[in-house]
From Swiss-Prot:
UniProt-listed Pfam families: DHHC (PF01529)
Annotated catalytic residues: C132
Protein name: Palmitoyltransferase pfa4
Compositional bias ranges of the Acidic residues kind: 386-399
Gene Ontology process terms (BP): protein targeting to membrane
Sorted UniProt keywords: Acyltransferase, Endoplasmic reticulum, Lipoprotein, Membrane, Palmitate, Transferase, Transmembrane, Transmembrane helix
Transmembrane residue ranges: 16-36, 52-72, 147-166, 179-201
Domain notes: The DHHC domain is required for palmitoyltransferase activity.
Stretches of the chain found on the membrane's Lumenal side: 37-51, 167-178
GO molecular function, one term: protein-cysteine S-palmitoyltransferase activity
Length: 486
């Protein structure tokens, strides 16, 4: 969904976002000065030296902070070569891996806490807030201070510009409303003031809202993505408390989420100082030399960008983000067709492929595979029709219809929307590249948040005995707990 943070969603339009921002700055910042200084009939006349100096200083600060917000590297994790090559060692108990981390399939590397894979930057971004199309860059651990300064100086310049504009609108138009038209401002001046007023109002409103939401997130220590995750978690809890067990309706687990507090809120001052990279508040809003936090790649898994202080409100560390029961349910049901091994009997030995078969045997095998594919497609269609029938029955239930209008059913990260209609995909997160809560390193099962299932509390992890996808590990865990042998 298009909004202030995510920008236009139409393919190809985002490449024009930065030129559009530059054009808007030039129009409001420099065309306005040209109009005010050349329209002698527009009271109270040209800008004074003091007004020009203040306005142009604000514009210089705006340009500097915008350039930094666009060009500063959002950060990149660098793992030791041995750690990346010896990935299976980390997947065993006793490996050198972190206490808890996700695994990025595209980067083929662990994903530290609060990091996400950006589909625009094509890498995992430390403490990713969102990908901003207006800067063409990710708002992250390293770029957030520059982004915040840009918003502050932009709003300051707009407020001062409003003073200059409305002074001329009052004295040049309203105060002379009874004067004959030929003695008032020219048509060009009137048209210019009208366009400037419209552009100023739209820009001031949008950027003031963006500044307020950004400052709020800054003080709470949350990123936009984490606010989205927190809202989804609250929605899941609300459905659970109301007895609306969406996940147990199909008999695949009956997940009941356990409340998880946001662990990275350590107080207003600590949150703000951590985000700006220094406790010296005098440097926070310097357009040059203000700096910001830098990721510590010299000591992987330790230092800035790799670990974050928690407030201790949860039973264990590393419980954020809360698990997505819908995603776990699909994986426990067989990974939704993601991995063929989930539907295979792994204990059955497969005959070796005979590469010297005749052409007739190959044709027969090909036709057999076609029949199997057709049968699987028919089963999927049948399953889909059964779901449609269930939904049709639920729609006849007035109570369910009323509940569905107030809360959206939880879906995967791409489809679930918050109250503003945003998904993780809108924030730039490549949701398809995230393995579910499970870089299976040392002690992972002890640090993951528990999820209540039909068979008890589970951390969503399977046995860590082989280097297999997490969905398969979860499936084996379910089979083992239910005593079902394939």
């Amino acid at each position: 969904m298009t909004n202030l943070q995510t920008g236009p969603t139409t393919r190809g339009l985002q490449r024009f976002a930065i030129p559009a921002v530059c054009g808007l700055i030039i129009f409001l910042g420099y065309y306005s000065q040209y109009l005010f200084n050349t329209s002698a009939d527009l009271a109270p006349g040209p800008l004074t030296c003091r007004e020009s100096l203040i306005f142009n200083i604000l514009l210089v600060c705006l340009w500097l902070t915008y350039y930094q917000a666009c060009t500063v590297d959002p950060g990149q994790y660098k793992f030791p070569p041995k750690e990346k090559e010896d990935g299976d060692n980390n997947n065993k108990r006793g490996g050198r891996g972190p206490q808890k981390a996700k695994w990025c399939k595209k980067c083929d590397a662990p994903k530290p806490p609060r990091a996400h894979h950006c589909r625009h930057c094509a890498r995992c971004i430390p403490r990713m807030d969102h990908h901003c199309p207006w800067t063409g860059n990710c708002v992250s651990l390293q770029t957030f201070p520059h982004f915040l300064r840009f918003l502050v100086y932009t709003n300051a310049a707009l407020v001062y510009f409003a003073r200059l504009l409305w002074t001329r609108l009052y004295y040049g138009l309203w105060d002379q409303r009874h004067v004959p038209a030929y003695l008032g401002p020219s048509v060009g001046a009137l048209l210019g003031c009208t366009m400037l007023s419209i552009a100023w109002f739209a820009t001031q409103f949008a950027l003031m809202v963006l500044l307020v939401t950004t400052v709020r997130s800054w003080m709470l220590g949350k990123t936009m993505i984490e606010e989205w995750e927190a809202e989804r978690h609250e929605t899941l809890l609300a459905r659970s408390y109301d007895g609306d067990d969406y996940w147990g309706a199909d008999g695949h687990g009956g997940f009941v989420p356990v409340k998880v507090e946001f662990p990275y809120d350590n107080g207003f001052w600590s949150n703000m100082a951590q985000a700006m990279g220094t406790n010296n508040f005098l440097r926070w809003f310097l357009p040059v030399g203000g700096g910001g936090p830098k990721i510590s790649n010299d000591t992987p898994w330790k230092g800035t960008g790799w670990e974050y202080e928690e407030n201790g409100f949860n039973d264990r560390v590393g419980m954020w983000p809360p698990p997505d029961p819908e995603k776990l349910r699909r994986e426990r049901a067989g990974a939704g067709g993601k991995w063929p091994g989930a539907r295979e009997n792994l204990n059955t030995e497969k005959p070796e492929v005979d590469y010297y078969r005749s052409s007739e045997d190959m044709k027969t095998a090909f036709k057999r595979r076609q029949q199997e594919d057709l049968r699987r497609r028919q089963q999927r269609r049948q399953h889909s029709s059964e779901e449609d029938e269930i939904m049709a029955e639920l729609e006849e239930d007035e109570g369910y219809e009323q509940r569905s209008r107030t809360r959206s059913p939880p879906q995967d990260g791409r489809a679930w929307m918050n109250s503003e209609g945003d998904t993780l995909w809108d924030y730039g997160v490549d949701v398809d590249e995230e393995e579910n809560y499970g870089y299976p390193g040392q002690g992972v099962s002890e640090s993951l948040p528990l999820v209540k299932t039909a068979t008890g509390y589970n951390d969503g992890q399977g046995d860590e005995d082989e280097d297999v996808p997490l969905a398969e590990l979860i499936r084996r865990r379910k089979v083992k707990s239910n005593g079902v042998h394939e």
